[in-house]
Amino acid sequence: VWSHDYRVKQKPPYDLALFVGVPENVPDKTFGFMLPNRRDYANDMYKFVGYVFPFNVEVYNSNQEVKRKLGYDSRPIIICSIGGTSIGKEVLELCGKAYSIAKKKIPDLQLKVVTGPRLTSNNLNLPKEVEAVGFVPRLYEHFAASDLAVVQGGATSTLELTALRRPFIYFPLEGHCEQEQVSRILTQH
């Protein structure tokens, strides 16, 4: 949960912050000794909008059709993404290592690594045949085309994958208040 100072220091400052989810997604405990309750603080700082998807799930019910639309061929593809954060280089590189092992069993397997807007693919140690890209608009379309996705534990990506009924593996960041709640949220959906 970001502080009020963060909101005020933005150029221009903003007076509204939206939280994709519900108040129960925020831990009902303090930030620490003598600090406010996280959920109470979030209720004061955010307007909770529920779970919002920028797509109609019915449009993406055939992953082969979505693959064709996006220019992928029919070979199996794994999409590995860390979302909008710069944390997660290790997850992407782990996907590259796992890909090399899996490719021995599934020779036509493809891996696309999405670094997001804050991490460049230049510093990643990945096999040469892995496609690494930065920010991808409408990433949910690529999730819909995937045969497997590997993501960090962010609620938006995991809920999109759940809505799209695509298999995924997620790695929540330890100590991250949102990502520690994701497994509970997913069991409700």
Segments from the language model and where they lie:
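Short, glycine/polar-rich helix-capping loops at beta-to-alpha or helix-loop-helix junctions
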Residues: 31-34, 120-122, 157-158, 177-184
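Active-site-proximal region of nucleotide-activated glycan assembly enzymes
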Residues: 1-55
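A donor-sugar binding/catalytic signature common to diverse glycosyltransferases
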Residues: 138-181
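Structural beta-sheet core signal
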Residues: 19, 48, 80, 111-113, ...
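Donor-nucleotide binding loops and adjacent catalytic segments primarily
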Residues: 28, 53-145
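Residues in the short beta-alpha loop(s) of Rossmann-like NAD(P)-binding domains
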Residues: 23, 115-118, 174
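Active-site-proximal loop->helix
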Residues: 2-10, 180-189
